[in-house]
């Protein structure tokens, strides 16, 4: 089946009110006529309100609804209560966020989030009607030890074991080899495709139908120079973009490359 690609920008810990407005205005100008690719941005949660306002009334033929959708970089498993500093699914929905990143290696590493905890976040998002963007991927040491597939399978199985394979219906997986995140080193298109094919095959062992529709993004130093070649690969359904998402022209090139390759 034809899968509609998704290119998502993860701003990480970057931005300000002024930056958010300026970048979104640039993105709207660059992307207003793009079709055939879903686009989302995940600014810091403090700027979701600013982003929501900036995205409304885009002034093009879409009837006032921007082609760019909102996302977020994290969520808690609790809906409300005494959980200082946390953000709930309902709060994210209140600002129109749809695509929510979970399991990013920076969260797994710096905040000690386990596979099982990430799976709980996945379940909370599904229950709330939001789209989980599940990040998986191996470290450089694991890659060199030939454990890439083992690590990816373990991180996917945490969700399957907790929620069943059907939980991946309408969900997104982002394969981000940790050794490629923010390093300037990217997996080659062939390397990335091999892992993406493994991921899809691993899910297909439980359900072919689920595997065929799940969006599998590549992430890890994706930029305007390497995106087009990555998107020629059959199992790469878009990208989760870090640094390059902070510049409207570069991010637009990536989005347009996905739209061109997959349509």
Swiss-Prot record:
PROSITE patterns: TIM_1, TIM_2. InterPro entries: Aldolase_TIM, TIM_sf, TrioseP_Isoase_bac/euk, Triosephosphate_isomerase, Triosephosphate_isomerase_AS. Pathway: Carbohydrate biosynthesis; gluconeogenesis; Carbohydrate degradation; glycolysis; D-glyceraldehyde 3-phosphate from glycerone phosphate: step 1/1. Its main location: cytoplasm. It is found in: Cytoplasm. Its EC number is 5.3.1.1. Substrate binds at residues 10-12, 182, 221, 242-243. Keywords: Cytoplasm, Gluconeogenesis, Glycolysis, Isomerase. It is an enzyme of class 5 (isomerase). GO terms for cellular component: cytosol. It catalyses: D-glyceraldehyde 3-phosphate = dihydroxyacetone phosphate. GO terms for molecular function: triose-phosphate isomerase activity. Gene3D superfamilies: Aldolase class I (3.20.20.70). GO terms for biological process: gluconeogenesis; glyceraldehyde-3-phosphate biosynthetic process; glycerol catabolic process; glycolytic process. The active site is at 104 (electrophile), 176 (proton acceptor). Belongs to the triosephosphate isomerase family. Involved in the gluconeogenesis. Catalyzes stereospecifically the conversion of dihydroxyacetone phosphate (DHAP) to D-glyceraldehyde-3-phosphate (G3P). Homodimer. This is Triosephosphate isomerase. The gene is tpiA.
